[in-house]
């Protein structure tokens, strides 16, 4: 087990919720605006204190120092504009500063793979201030993946992403989910807040549905994302249909 959260809370934003995260597991937090998703996943980063107990790799999260946390997990907050002005490759290099002297050829290989996966290879010499919203988000994602890429960081275990697909078009979103699956296949646990319920239905191993700061239900996507639970939580009409062997949600309002 990577992480064990017991009675995680920050009232009234988040009421006590307990869950575990295993190696290679993809966990989605879903729920309406203001339901506590960002609050919950930000606490897993170890940067925000709240109530309850988080055990991360067998040790209390609060007992880790920041350099150790930077090697073991990465936290990508909700999208913000760049605060400073550097080239993309320079920005990506900042992700490596926490790592223990990774081999240069391994770094180059990781960089090539991540940049190709997120389609930013042609952006490496651009200033981050000049990127579009979706391009900047892909650069932020690339930096996050680089920080916890197993081939250059053997201590990496957890990737925490707050609405990573915000600002991405459907093609770039598909590429992002492919990369997330690739990270999970390498044993990295991925926890994310998400609004695209069809993606959650397809991509998540475990889902926590929040409403008004409380966890309404948690479990597998098919158990959690029933029409009744989604309609009552989101106060909108939902239909779930089967299409080519896959469940698909339709929103009629
Ligand atoms: N820094 C803060 N101080 C006080 N209240 C806050 C703070 N940040 C968020 N909140 C409140 O806590 C509640 C939960 O917010 P949170 O950001 O966790 O929701 P969310 O589910 O991630 O929402 P969204 O889908 O809109 O991103 C909201 O009512 C929000 O207004």
From Swiss-Prot:
SUPFAM superfamilies in alphabetical order: P-loop containing nucleoside triphosphate hydrolases
Catalytic activity entry: an R-cob(III)alamin(out) + ATP + H2O = an R-cob(III)alamin(in) + ADP + phosphate + H(+)
Pfam families per the UniProt record, alphabetical: ABC_tran (PF00005)
Top-tier EC class: translocase
Membrane topology: Peripheral membrane protein
Main location: membrane
Key words of the record: ATP-binding, Cell inner membrane, Cell membrane, Membrane, Nucleotide-binding, Translocase, Transport
Subcellular location: Cell inner membrane
Gene Ontology CC, one term: plasma membrane
UniProt binding sites for ATP: 31-38
InterPro entries per record: AAA+_ATPase (IPR003593), ABC_transporter-like_ATP-bd (IPR003439), ABC_transptr_BtuD (IPR023693), Metal_Ion_Import_ABC (IPR050153), P-loop_NTPase (IPR027417)
EC number: 7.6.2.8
Domain ABC transporter: 3-237
Family membership: Belongs to the ABC transporter superfamily. Vitamin B12 importer (TC 3.A.1.13.1) family.
Cross-referenced PANTHER family: METAL TRANSPORT SYSTEM ATP-BINDING PROTEIN TM_0124-RELATED, VITAMIN B12 IMPORT ATP-BINDING PROTEIN BTUD
Quaternary structure annotation from Swiss-Prot or TrEMBL: The complex is composed of two ATP-binding proteins (BtuD), two transmembrane proteins (BtuC) and a solute-binding protein (BtuF).
Function: Part of the ABC transporter complex BtuCDF involved in vitamin B12 import. Responsible for energy coupling to the transport system.
Family annotation (NCBIfam families): PRK03695.1
Name of the protein this chain belongs to: Vitamin B12 import ATP-binding protein BtuD
Organism encoding this protein: Photobacterium profundum (strain SS9)
Lineage: Bacteria, Pseudomonadati, Pseudomonadota, Gammaproteobacteria, Vibrionales
Gene: btuD
